[in-house]
Every structure is written in C-alpha cells, then in structure tokens.
Amino acid sequence: RYLWYKHARASYKKWGAPIYIQLAFIKKESDFNWLAKPPRVKLFKVIPFKRPSSSFGYSQAVEGTWRQYKRETGNKLATRARFKDSVDFIGWYVNKTTTLLKIPKNDAYRQYLAYYKGWGDYKNYSKDKKAIIYARSVKETASKYRKQLTLCRKNLDKNKYIIF
C-alpha cells in the first residue's frame, strides 16, 4: 500500500500529524474500510433503523466536521471515501486540536480522545469509559505502527515509479 504511505506522508508534511497516529486513527475508526458506516440502531432489537451518526469512510468523519474541513482547507472536492482526503482530514484535525486544546501532535491517547469526543466535549472524557478504552487501544496501535514504520521507512521512502 505504497500510495497510502505516500498520502499519509504528505499529510504529515502539511499538518505535522505523525503518520503512525493517522493510521492508528483509521484502524480504530474504520479498520481501513473505505465505505465504513456505523451500524444501524435496531427497533425492537430486530428491525434496522437509523444510524447513530453521519460518520462515513476511512476517517469516520461526521458531516458537520467534514464540511468545516472542506471550507477551511478549500478542498471542495474532498470525499470521505478517498484515503488521500481522509488522512488529510485527520492531519487537519490533529493540527487544529493542538491549536485549540494544546495537545501535542504525537500524543496518540489524548489526540484520539479529542477526535472521538470532539473539541467541545473533550473536557468531559473522564466520564466516558468507552472513550478511554478506545484511546488506550489507539495509543497501543500507534506505538506498534511507529515501530513498524521505523523498520520500513527506507523502503517506503524510495520512489516506486520509474519515469522514462
């Protein structure tokens, strides 16, 4: 998945969000499924009903935050199902979280709590046990990805295409 690395690296260069954190967010949010959506709520435990949120794609960005991202970045053609746009969105979000909440960009645990809860509700995360469990999981995944990237970086940074 060389292009995934290339796009994540471009997001890192643009926003400063570490590649391993971008990938850990995507792993947790969508398991790298470009069409991921939250499961439908069931009526009477049987009948599929509404989805609990508008989140969609690799990053599971909700519509309102996605619109804000497109407006602020000028990336009007961005789509949540495109990996390139999803990692750019995550980079933008991590960068904005650092500005708004003063959370270091390499703090996977606190960055994910802000991503999961939203900027406004971040201060209440200590009451949300599920968010804390998810953030610990993302922190572990980010640590694993960081080690793997360290081992593979030389191969990944090579230009994969020869232009004649």
Please place each PLM-identified region on the residue numbering:
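Short, solvent-exposed mixed-charge patches
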Residues: I163-F164
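Catalytic glycan-binding domains that act on GlcNAc-containing polysaccharides
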Residues: R1-N159
